[in-house]
Curated annotation (Swiss-Prot):
GO MF, any single term: metal ion binding
Purpose of the protein: One of several proteins that assist in the late maturation steps of the functional core of the 30S ribosomal subunit. Helps release RbfA from mature subunits. May play a role in the assembly of ribosomal proteins into the subunit. Circularly permuted GTPase that catalyzes slow GTP hydrolysis, GTPase activity is stimulated by the 30S ribosomal subunit.
Top-level taxon in the UniProt lineage: Bacteria
Binding site for Zn(2+): C273, C278, H280, C286
Assembly information from the UniProt record: Monomer. Associates with 30S ribosomal subunit, binds 16S rRNA.
Single GO BP term: ribosomal small subunit biogenesis
InterPro entries: G_CP_dom, NA-bd_OB-fold, P-loop_NTPase, Ribosome_biogen_GTPase_RsgA, RsgA_GTPase_dom
UniProt protein name: Small ribosomal subunit biogenesis GTPase RsgA
Cited Pfam families: RsgA_GTPase
Length: 321
């Protein structure tokens, strides 16, 4: 008679600690836990895990957000081994997070000052993921209601529906939490110093994440979050705080740049231009309206890609790859 197969449980990787993985179980049998207490039954169980060497042999890297199967479970020590990884539904490279369902781009209205170029870089990075993109304006209390309305109208012109929040007054936090509760895994990103960590501390009062100050000279925040970790917002909804950085990279393929700008929606779907590979600059027969605010930013990004393309080819040739 064959030996009984060792039990396996499904979970999600919520943090990486050196060579260990922290896995939050999706389902488990409380009666199997020797040290489990009913006082903690409101919190999902997390196990500290290593990983099977066969995953390395298969080249199966494991990252935060991955759905995994754990085995060889030691309930008393709350340890286990990750034996297998489920296929990913989505993937973000920077920071590395799997199975993201929404990206929340956080931008400050002030301190640091709103920078349209920098904001566009973060939004383009978010659009590349192919998941829902939400735009949040932080530090709403630092500007007047009229100034805020002007900024909201401006960003609606970019094709977004921004939400304004204030950690100091609590304004907008309830609406933001309701929005995030409908998504499985939301990643927060944005420049350092815009208040992502402070915002998460308000959304998740049980946390105590370190908060960094904003440097006065450059108006850039000192990085506070050093690693990616998932936190439970409510049943079925997780959020991730990610290391802040000030200048995300532009997309690798310039031909895909236009579709990452919502302002192009409806303009290029039916190919109004004479040439299907039109870059919407000065090409003959271009049918795209160029009167929108971020069009100069779009052109600058294309020029930057052109310079990078030439550099990668040793300075020879012209045009975009």
């Amino acid at each position: 008679m064959a030996a009984a197969e060792a039990p396996r449980l499904a979970g999600m990787v919520v943090a990486l600690q050196a060579n260990f993985l922290e896995v939050e179980l999706e389902t488990f049998n409380p009666s199997s836990l020797v040290s489990w207490r009913r006082s903690t039954d409101a919190e999902p169980l997390r196990l500290l895990c290593t990983r099977r060497t066969r995953l390395d042999h298969r080249g199966a890297a494991v990252h935060v957000g991955d759905r995994v199967w754990v085995e060889a479970i030691d309930w008393q020590e709350r340890r286990a081994v990750v034996g297998d990884v489920e296929p990913r539904q989505s993937w973000i490279n920077r920071p590395p997070v799997a199975n993201v369902t929404a990206v929340v781009v956080a931008l400050a209205v002030k301190q640091p000052c709103f920078d349209a170029d920098q904001a566009s870089r973060f939004l383009l990075s978010a659009e590349q993921t192919g998941v829902d993109v939400h735009l949040i304006l932080t530090k709403r209390d630092l500007i007047t209601s009229d100034q805020l309305e002007q900024q909201l109208v401006r960003l609606r012109g970019w094709g977004y529906r921004p939400m304004a929040v204030s950690v100091q007054t609590g304004e907008g936090l309830g609406a933001l939490k309701n929005k995030l509760s409908s998504t499985r895994l939301a990643v927060f990103c944005g420049p350092s110093g815009v208040g992502k960590t402070s915002l998460l501390n308000q959304l998740l009062p049980q946390l105590s994440l370190r908060v960094g100050a904003v440097s006065g000279r450059l108006q850039r925040g000192r990085h506070t979050t050093r690693h990616v970790e998932l936190f439970r917002l409510c049943e079925g909804s997780l959020v991730a705080d990610t290391p802040g950085f000030n200048r995300p990279e532009l997309p690798a393929d310039p031909r895909k740049l236009a579709v990452l700008f919502p302002e192009f929606d409806g303009q290029i779907e039916d190919y109004p231009c004479r040439f299907r590979d039109c870059f919407h600059r000065d090409e003959p027969g271009c049918g795209v309206d160029k009167s929108w605010e971020r069009y100069p930013i779009y052109k600058r990004f294309l020029e930057e890609m052109e310079c990078l393309s030439r550099s990668s080819r040793g300075g020879s040739g012209s045009g975009l790859l």
